[in-house]
Amino acid sequence: MAWIQIRLNSTNERAEAISDFLEELGSVSVTFMDSQDTPIFEPLPGETRLWGNTDVIALFDAETEMQPVLTALRQSGLLEEGFAYKIEQIEDKDWEREWMDNFHPMQFGKRLWICPSWREIPDPNAVNVMLDPGLAFGTGTHPTTALCLEWLDGLDLTGKTVIDFGCGSGILAIAALKLGAKNAIGIDIDPQAILASGSNAQANGVADRLQLFLSDRQPADLKADVVVANILAGPLKELYPVISQLVKPKGDLGLSGILKTQAASVCEAYAQTFELEPVAVREEWCRITGKLA
């Protein structure tokens, strides 16, 4: 069976109302997506967490006349004047198979691979992390995650303790453990991230070496040889006193989730106590690394 798909750009404040309205107009399915691949966690019961700039995607039966749908949307007041939209015909497919086919093993640095569980491992002798998209995003596809994974791959983590601040799926902490770290600690504000990290650690056989804490319950004396934080520039600057205190003397720090235009202000904050290295850039994103002076 074929479908007609309409994709509308919206804000997170209006996305749910638009979704409800489209269902009233006869949509059989409505989903939310972010074109910039920004990480987001699965919502808690009764909660819908969205990106600041959200695309609303609705499917209609192929026989649906879309002009009345567009007219109703214009008259609803839910979208800005001259709102952007795209309508296209979608052929029926095995959507689960299609989704799975889009994820492939990815290499980061010289040793590290991130592999979906349903794919064959390209190099059994490499450091392989098995991770599937699921409870929390963070699978290596976003430039910031890739930058952090490559940085960890380039460090000698043998016998060291690593803190993954804002752990999400736990991908960075798990990768660090597989790369030789003795122990890792994951910290996040979201309980769903803690669950996801624990599940992924279990699947990779490293759960016994990973401690997980909600940020308001982390021990006051936490310290690590390596601290990595892949969040956003604003929180990185605000949390400078917290993050910098987590790093042991002569320890390593890696920060990402930072746009190129924001790098200077983040560097200014952390240069107070860290000897910073040249900024690494990928697409519009960058990574800041340094050693505690």
Curated annotation (Swiss-Prot):
Binding sites annotated in the UniProt record for S-adenosyl-L-methionine: T145, G166, D188, N230
Keyword Transferase: yes
Compartments in which it is found: Cytoplasm
Superkingdom of origin organism: Bacteria
GO BP field: methylation
EC number(s) from the headed UniProt entry: 2.1.1.-
GO cellular component terms, A-Z: cytosol
Keywords: Cytoplasm, Methyltransferase, S-adenosyl-L-methionine, Transferase
Main location: cytoplasm
Coiled coil: none
Gene3D superfamilies: Vaccinia Virus protein VP39
Catalysed reaction equations from the record: L-lysyl-[protein] + 3 S-adenosyl-L-methionine = N(6),N(6),N(6)-trimethyl-L-lysyl-[protein] + 3 S-adenosyl-L-homocysteine + 3 H(+)
GO molecular function, one term: protein-lysine N-methyltransferase activity
Keyword S-adenosyl-L-methionine among record annotations: yes
Signal sequence, start to end: none
Similarity remark: Belongs to the methyltransferase superfamily. PrmA family.
Functional summary from the UniProt entry: Methylates ribosomal protein L11.
PANTHER family linked to this entry: ELECTRON TRANSFER FLAVOPROTEIN BETA SUBUNIT LYSINE METHYLTRANSFERASE
Protein's name in the database: Ribosomal protein L11 methyltransferase
Origin species: Actinobacillus succinogenes (strain ATCC 55618 / DSM 22257 / CCUG 43843 / 130Z)
